Regions:
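Conserved Rossmann-like nucleotide-cofactor binding loop
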Residues: 44, 81, 117
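Short hydrophobic beta-strand segments that form the core of ligand-binding sensory/regulatory domains
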Residues: 120
């Protein structure tokens, strides 16, 4: 059996915990050292990892971490009953709402956390 976990780099561990617990309903599982916290949503763990801006995520590349809005081909989708309620909490806790769509299939909101990481809130 394989279990999925997700790692998210952040510049402020306490702020990230507050955001993911308060806005998205994640549960705190434990601290893992001084620079990592483990959260849980349903059966998936989210590892929040404090990484300083400007540090290198890869030894083989000149890319440096920054926490401005950035795009990645992989993102998280959080499924919920009430998209508008979750978006309001995201905004209150420092995240952003970048638009969305609505149709017969449901509703989606495009959002970011305070560290530039994009994700979607979906009601199907």
């Amino acid at each position: 059996m394989i279990k999925l976990s997700v790692s998210i780099d952040v510049s402020n561990l306490k702020g990230a915990e507050d955001f993911y617990v308060g806005a998205l309903g994640c549960k705190k599982v434990r601290d893992q050292g001084t620079n990592m916290a483990v959260l849980c949503v349903e059966k998936s763990d989210i590892y929040l990892q404090k990484k300083e801006p400007g540090t290198k995520p890869l030894t083989s590349n000149n890319v440096a971490r920054d926490y401005q809005r950035h795009w990645t081909p992989i993102h998280l989708d959080f499924l919920c009953d009430n998209v508008n309620e979750i978006v309001a909490r995201i905004l209150k806790l420092g995240g952003s709402h970048e638009g969305g769509e609505r149709g017969d299939w449901g509703t989606i909101a495009y959002c970011t956390d305070p560290f530039g990481n994009g994700f979607c809130i979906i009601n199907e």
